[in-house]
Amino acid sequence: MTKSEKKSLNESLAQWKLFLYNPTTREFLGRTAKSWGLILLFYLVFYGFLAALFTFTMWAMLQTLNDEIPKYRDQIPSPGLMVFPKPVTALEYTFSVSDPSSYEGYIKDLKKFLKSYSLDEQKNLNKCTDGVLFEQTGPVYAACQFPDSLLEACSGTDDPDFGYSQGQPCVLVKMNRIIGLKPEGSPRIDCISKDENTAMVSTYPNQGVIDLKYFPYYGKKLHVGYLQPLVAVQVSFGSNSTKKEVTVECKIEGSKNLRNEDDRDKFLGRVAFKITARA
């Protein structure tokens, strides 16, 4: 049969069958059982070696890491500020005083978050000395009490609605945790209203003080039970104010080694949020 001639269907099937298995040479897909065994053994050894090399490399790298303290911390010299409860819209709290469902989620989140700040939950925590860094050498690291009574009108004790039902909402401001951070001076969180004619801002504890006794922080695994110091911000709109909308800006002040300005990070040591209270 010449090259130009087409093979019949039976001849093509016969050649495929012969390729799949040749009874004369006992070859399967062009290879004998010995050949298949050798090539499978080669790939088994080859990929087994790669897997072992990868496993050893990962193991060697993990030996250089500490499971309790991050190895590289020099890129986070100063903490940022966060607000709580988390707004539905980015950094904007909008609610209606006459509609409890509009702020129900905020109240629920605040109660859940502040549960660990109740005195009953802090029985095993230390009553630390005010105004002094609480440095420890381990291996057991104690945590200081932060009673919710420090938040006064925003503690949820006297007003379970945290002021939302009266149009005087409370927002919690907290510093991000940084392991080993030792603030200098007398750190505090100052909060101001961008429009003083519209609303008045109150902070709790008084003057937004962040006590040094809550520093340094030793990490989640070592510092079991640690409570972040909080500052509560309460906004009160004037009775004659027709505009129930204000922007509040909070900054870390009073400490040389805590920055509150950075062109590349607008949350470094500061945060701004907007509150809109409808009738």
From Swiss-Prot:
GO terms for molecular function: ATPase activator activity. Pfam families: Na_K-ATPase. It comes from the Eukaryota. Disulfide bonds join C128-C144, C154-C170, C191-C250. InterPro entries: Na/K_ATPase_sub_beta, Na/K_ATPase_sub_beta_sf. Glycans are attached at N240. This is Sodium/potassium-transporting ATPase subunit beta-3. It comes from Cavia porcellus.
